[in-house]
C-alpha cells in the first residue's frame, strides 16, 4: 500500500525540461566558440616580394575542412618573403614564406673563423642568398677557396672548421 502523491508525471516533466535545456546548450556551444581566423592577401603577392601589413587582411575561416599550416596572425607574415605567388582571398601557407636574406649572392661579405683564442677574418662572395642561420657556400676573394659558413645576424659568415 502506498500513501502519498503519484510524482511520476512531475518527474517526467522535470526530466524533459533538463534534456531540452541540455540539447539547447549543445546547439549553442559551437556558436559560442570563437571561429578561427586566417590571413589572406588583398592583392596578388609575387615570389620574392616582402609582405607588409597593408597587403593582408584577417578573415574568419568558414571551411571546416581547410588544411592546417596557414598564417593566422600578422606577426607570422610581416617582413617575410613570399616563395610562391599568393592569390587574393586564399589563405597564406606558412611554408610559402621565408625569412629575408641577410647575404645576397655575388656581394662582398666578411668571413669570420674562430679557433681557440685566434680569430681570422677575410672577404668572400656568397654563392647563394642566405637568411639568418642558413649554411651557404662562399668563395674567399683572396685565395679563391670555397668554404661553407653560417649566416649570422650582423650579415657576416661564421666559417665552419673541416
Curated annotation (Swiss-Prot):
It comes from the Bacteria. It is found in: Periplasm. Its main location: periplasm. It comes from Agrobacterium fabrum (strain C58 / ATCC 33970). GO terms for cellular component: periplasmic space. GO terms for biological process: bacterial-type flagellum assembly. Belongs to the FlgA family. Keywords: Bacterial flagellum biogenesis, Periplasm, Signal. This is Flagellar protein FlgA. Gene3D superfamilies: 2.30.30.760, Antifreeze-like/N-acetylneuraminic acid synthase C-terminal domain. Residues 1-26 form the signal peptide. PANTHER family: FLAGELLA BASAL BODY P-RING FORMATION PROTEIN FLGA (PTHR36307:SF1).
Amino acid at each position: 500500500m502506498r500513501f502519498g502523491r503519484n510524482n511520476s508525471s512531475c518527474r517526467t516533466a522535470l526530466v524533459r525540461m533538463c534534456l531540452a535545456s541540455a540539447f539547447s546548450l549543445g546547439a549553442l556551444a559551437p556558436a559560442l566558440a570563437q571561429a578561427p581566423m586566417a590571413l589572406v592577401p588583398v592583392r596578388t603577392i609575387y615570389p620574392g616580394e616582402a609582405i607588409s601589413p597593408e597587403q593582408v587582411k584577417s578573415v574568419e575561416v568558414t571551411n571546416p575542412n581547410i588544411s592546417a599550416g596557414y598564417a593566422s596572425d600578422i606577426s607570422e607574415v610581416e617582413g617575410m618573403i613570399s616563395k610562391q605567388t599568393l592569390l587574393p582571398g586564399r589563405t597564406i601557407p606558412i611554408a610559402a614564406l621565408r625569412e629575408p636574406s641577410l647575404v645576397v649572392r655575388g656581394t662582398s661579405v666578411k668571413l669570420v673563423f674562430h679557433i681557440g683564442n685566434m680569430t681570422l677574418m677575410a672577404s668572400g662572395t656568397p654563392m647563394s642568398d642566405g637568411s639568418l642561420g642558413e649554411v651557404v657556400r662562399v668563395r674567399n676573394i683572396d685565395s679563391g677557396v670555397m668554404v661553407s659558413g653560417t649566416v649570422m645576424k650582423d650579415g657576416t659568415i661564421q666559417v665552419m672548421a673541416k
